[in-house]
Amino acid sequence: EQDIRLMKQNNLNTVRNSHYPTHPYWYHLCDLYGLYIIDEANIESHGMGYGAASLAKDSTWLPAHMDRVQRMYERSKNHPAIIIWSLGNEAGNGINFERTYDWMKSVEQSRPVQYERAEQQYNTDIYCRMYRSVDELLAYAHQTSPKVYRPFIMTEYLHTMGNSGGGLKEYMEVFESEPVVQGGCIWDWV
């Protein structure tokens, strides 16, 4: 509970449950304190790569992907703090995420569904890349080409490796000045 109080005191309004759903009490506290949740299915397989070897492209893994997404949804669907469903993290993109997205959209019409590796494909409602530079965010906000245009929320940024949170002011300026760039989740809260 103290973590949530500290987050609220520091004007944080959203947490991403990464890379799996968390304890039921956490959801209760977020409902109580008004902290938004991006709830994420327990699908994380970046060790398998993002190319042809990705489990996302191997339909024998579809039942496992579907089971994890369905369990997340059924367990958490009645929590008002959840504002976005996430299909997983860094597990490539392919048929398994297309099918889990289709299933989520068939049962859930009120909240968006995101998947970071889907980038600009159809199986995400939000463009949710990680570790984009301020210049990349501005380029997205000001694009004029006929790309798919979705809200941009960084699933991770300001990882403590490297610049250890440097540049927060510049990111905040973009979040506040560009309506399509809606913020992000700092990696990570410990």
Cite the ranges covered by each PLM segment.
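Substrate-binding/catalytic cleft of secreted carbohydrate-active enzymes
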Residues: 4-6, 14-190
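Active-site-adjacent "gating/activation" loops or surface patches in catalytic cores
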Residues: 1
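Metal- or metallocofactor-binding catalytic centers and their adjacent structured scaffolds
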Residues: 10
